[in-house]
Design a protein with these regions (language model features):
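Conserved alpha/beta enzyme-core scaffold
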Residues: 1-421
Length: 422
C-alpha cells in the first residue's frame, strides 16, 4: 500500500502511537503523507488533527512536517523539532511532558485514552509473522499491543544484520500482577529479539528505504573537556575511597553535545571494561565500544552522526555482539536503574544554589524539549550528575542562578552539579 493510501486510514481526532526515539526508528513515509492529507482537509474546510505519542523525539520530516501542516492536536512525551516547539509554546499543540519510563504504562493503564492506530517502523517481517525491530525500540511493543489497528513501515535502509540485536521483554504486567524484572547485569538478555503483533490488526504495510536523522555533534570544546575531566577525577576519587567498585558501575549519558563530550573524555580515562545502561547510544558510546574501553552497551535507541552511522553499518557484526536494544520501559525502569547502580550523567538548562535543576523550561515558561529520561535516572541512580557550561548565549546568561525559574529535579534528586568551573 502507498503511504497516501495508508494515511487515509487515520481519521481526524484519534490517538496515534508512532515509533521513534531521539531521531531514530521513526516512520519515514506516513508522517509526510498525513501532513499532506491534513493540508487537503484544511483546504476543503474540514478539521484534521491527530494526537501523536512516540518514544521520544523524532525528526523534522515527522514532527516538523506534522506541526507545519497543523496536523498535531496533542504531542507526547518529548520533542526537539523547532517548528513543533514553536507551536507548543504558542498553545497550538497540547504537549504532555512525561518521564519516559512512565509513557508505556500510562498508555497501558488507559490514563491517556484509547489508541486507534499504531504506525511502527520495522526492518522486516519473519515468515511466522514476527517483526524485526529497527534502530529504536522505544514504546513500540506497547503500541503494537494496545492499538486497534497497526500500520507497518518496512524500512530496508538500516543494516539487515541488526536482526538479533534487540531484547524485547514481554514479562511486564498491570498491578497487582507485576513481578520483579529478572535483569541483574546491564548486559543480560531477558526477552526475545522480535516484536509481536496480531496479524488481524495490521491494516497496511508501507515499504521505505530511508535513513534516520543525521545528528550533528560539535567537537568537544575547552569547556566540555573541563567538565569531562572533573567527572573523571570525581569517579577516580570515589573509586580510591572505596565508594565505587574497581570494575565501575554501568553508565547512563543523556543526549547532546556536552553529554557526548563527557563520553569522549572517558576514552582517555583510567576506567576499563565499562558497561552502558542508557536510553540512547550516541557517537561517544560507539567510540568507547570500538576502542575496547566499554565491553557492552544497553539502550533503547541508536542515534548517530553520519560518519558514526557509516562505521556502525560497516562493522555491524562487531556491534551486534556488543549492543542490546530494549523497550524504553526497561531501559529507563527505576527498578533496574537502582538495582544496577547506574551512574547517571544528564544535561540541564540551569541549576540553582539550593541544588534544584531545570531541564525543560527556558525562563520558566518556554518549553525546550522535555524532561526525557533524566528523572528516571537521576532519582534512582547510584550517582547523579547534572552537567552544563556555567553560562549560555555567549556569556549573557548564567546557568547557575539564585532560584530556578522551573524545577524538574529537586535538591533531593540531585547529587553532583558540574560546570567547566568544577
Amino acid at each position: 500500500m502507498t503511504a497516501e493510501q495508508a494515511a487515509a486510514l487515520i481519521p481526524h481526532g484519534v490517538n496515534v502511537g508512532m515509533s521513534g526515539f531521539t531521531g531514530a526508528g521513526y516512520p519515514k513515509a506516513l508522517p509526510q503523507a498525513i501532513a499532506q492529507h491534513a493540508k487537503s482537509e484544511h483546504a476543503a474546510g474540514r478539521p484534521y488533527k491527530i494526537n501523536v505519542w512516540t518514544g521520544a523525539s523524532t525528526a523534522a520530516e515527522m514532527d516538523g512536517a506534522l506541526a507545519e501542516a497543523g496536523a498535531l492536536g496533542q504531542r507526547l512525551p518529548f520533542n526537539t523539532d523547532p517548528t513543533c516547539r514553536a507551536r507548543i509554546n504558542a498553545g497550538e499543540i497540547d504537549f504532555i511532558d512525561m518521564h519516559l519510563s512512565h509513557v508505556a504504562q500510562h498508555a497501558w493503564f488507559g490514563f491517556l485514552g484509547p489508541m486507534s492506530v499504531a504506525v511502527v517502523e520495522v526492518l522486516g517481517v519473519t515468515e511466522d509473522g514476527r517483526l524485526i525491530p529497527s534502530t529504536a525500540v522505544g514504546n513500540n511493543k506497547t503500541w503494537l499491543e494496545i492499538a486497534d489497528k497497526v500500520i507497518l513501515e518496512v524500512n530496508t535502509k538500516p543494516p539487515a544484520k541488526m536482526e538479533g540485536m534487540h531484547d524485547i521483554y514481554y514479562g511486564t504486567a498491570i498491578p497487582p500482577r507485576r513481578v520483579p524484572i529478572a535483569l541483574t547485569h546491564a548486559d543480560d538478555r531477558i526477552g526475545e529479539p522480535y516484536l509481536r503483533v496480531d496479524p488481524a490488526k495490521v491494516v497496511a504495510v508501507v515499504e521505505t528505504h530511508k535513513g534516520d536523522r543525521d545528528n550533528v555533534f560539535a567537537q568537544p570544546d575547552a569547556n566540555s573537556n573541563l567538565i569531562a575531566a572533573s567527572i573523571i577525577d570525581f569517579l577516580a576519587h570515589e573509586m580510591k575511597m572505596g565508594r565505587l567498585p574497581k570494575e565501575m558501575l554501568p553508565i547512563q549519558s543523556g543526549v547532546g553535545n556536552v553529554a557526548n563530550a563527557v563520553l569522549a573524555g572517558l576514552l582517555t580515562g583510567p576506567f576499563e571494561n565499562l558497561l552502558g545502561f542508557t536510553e540512547v547510544l550516541q557517537d561517544g558510546m560507539l567510540d568507547l565500544l570500538r576502542a575496547g574501553k566499554m565491553s557492552r552497551a544497553s539502550a533503547t535507541s541508536i542515534s548517530l552522526s553520519g560518519s558514526a552511522y557509516r562505521d556502525f553499518e560497516e562493522n555491524i557484526d562487531f556491534y551486534r555482539e556488543r549492543i542490546i536494544l530494549r523497550p524504553q520501559e526497561i531501559s529507563n525502569h527505576p527498578e533496574l536503574v537502582r538495582r544496577l547502580g547506574v551512574i547517571a550523567m544528564n544535561s540541564m538548562i540551569e541549576a540553582d544554589i539550593y541544588g534544584n535543576i531545570n531541564s525543560t523550561h527556558v525562563m520558566g515558561t518556554g518549553m525546550m524539549n522535555g524532561i526525557g529520561g533524566s528523572g528516571d535516572f537521576a532519582r534512582n541512580g547510584y550517582l547523579s550528575f547534572f552537567v552544563t557550561p556555567s553560562v549560555a548565549k555567549g556569556g549573557k546568561i548564567s546557568c547557575i542562578v539564585p532560584m530556578c525559574s522551573h524545577v524538574d529535579h529537586t535538591e533531593h534528586d540531585t547529587q553532583i552539579i558540574v560546570t567547566e568551573q568544577g
